[in-house]
Design a protein with these regions (language model features):
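NAD(P)H-binding glycine-rich loop region in Rossmannoid oxidoreductase-like domains
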Residues: 45-82, 86, 90-94, 107-114
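SDR active-site strand-loop-helix element
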Residues: 6, 61-65, 100-106, 144-146
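N-terminal Rossmann NAD(P)H-binding glycine-rich loop of SDR-like oxidoreductase domains
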Residues: 1-26
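Substrate-positioning beta->alpha
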Residues: 156-164, 181-202, 234, 238
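Glycine-rich "substrate-gating" loop/helix at the edge of Rossmann-like oxidoreductase active sites
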Residues: 116, 147-157, 179-187, 222-229
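Mid/C-terminal beta-alpha module of Rossmann-like enzyme folds, strongest
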Residues: 198-244
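Conserved beta-loop-beta element that borders a ligand/cofactor-binding pocket
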Residues: 128-153, 167, 173-182, 219
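Conserved Rossmann-fold NAD(P)-dependent oxidoreductase catalytic core, especially the SDR/UDP-sugar
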Residues: 85-127, 132-137, 141-142
């Protein structure tokens, strides 16, 4: 099997690629059904020709590329919708209808505090693009709406409140909390990677959404990781303070 990972140098991409390499090299034997021949790592420094080659040969695509902290709000749509369009167009060009996974966000629900999120709007546009692609080509698409992620190799002050809080407390920096009563849904990176490996084996967990909550459904439109943790923001700060 040849696997394309876009956004391979990002937080999720690094963790996924490391696990794929361990499986490929026989260091991780928990997935004996997976036979990995090639891992194509595509990121911002990769060339258009590399994308052409990878899209022509891939048996499965993890699309993790995206923009979280743009200099301008318009970059959300360009980075999250624009590249997704380029990726799918390139797959179509080569007649490759392999399964494609999309890393979306819970912000794509545009519910509550996410209602005016430009990031969420760009992710929702990417989702609709993928669903239209599936209808047009018959390819399987697996759309995951990630909640708040945390774990190793996560950058502070970027896309994880946990990484930011840990960094600030470790370095005696102040923590800013606007509303300590906010409930967060957290997903640990290793739990996410296990779900992504399930998807690679054809065992993705399907769901539909009732507001912000994933509801298991065998024929669900979306996919999700089973193990998440719901916590109050203020309680996270109190817990981390205990490590000082």
């Amino acid at each position: 099997m040849k696997i394309l990972v876009t956004g391979a140098k990002g937080f999720v991409g690094q963790n996924l690629v490391a696990n794929l390499i361990n499986i490929q090299q026989g260091k991780n034997r928990t997935r004996p059904a997976l036979q990995i021949d090639e891992i194509y790592e595509y990121d911002i420094t990769s060339t258009p020709q590399e994308l052409e080659t990878y899209c022509a040969q891939a048996d499965f695509v993890f699309n993790l590329a995206g923009v979280n902290r743009p200099k301008d709000q318009s970059e959300f749509m360009q980075g999250n919708f624009g590249f997704a369009s380029t990726l799918l167009d390139t797959l179509k060009k080569h007649g490759n209808t392999c399964p494609v996974m999309l890393a979306s966000s819970i912000q794509a629900t545009l519910i509550g505090r996410y209602g005016e999120s430009d990031y969420g709007k760009s992710k929702l546009a990417g989702e609709e693009l993928f669903f239209a692609y599936a209808k047009e080509t018959g390819a399987q698409v697996l759309v995951y709406r990630f909640p708040n992620l945390f774990g190793k190799w996560c950058r502070p002050n970027y896309n994880s409140v946990i990484a930011t809080f840990c960094n600030n407390i470790a370095n005696d920096l102040p923590i800013q909390v606007n509303d300590a009563s906010v409930e967060l849904e957290l997903l640990y990176i290793d739990d996410l990677v296990e779900e992504m490996l399930d998807a690679l084996e054809g065992k993705a967990h399907r769901c539909n959404y009732d507001g912000l909550a994933a509801q298991a459904a065998a024929d669900g439109r979306y996919c999700y990781a089973l193990t998440t943790h719901k916590v109050i923001l203020g309680e996270i700060v109190e817990l981390l303070d205990l490590f000082k």
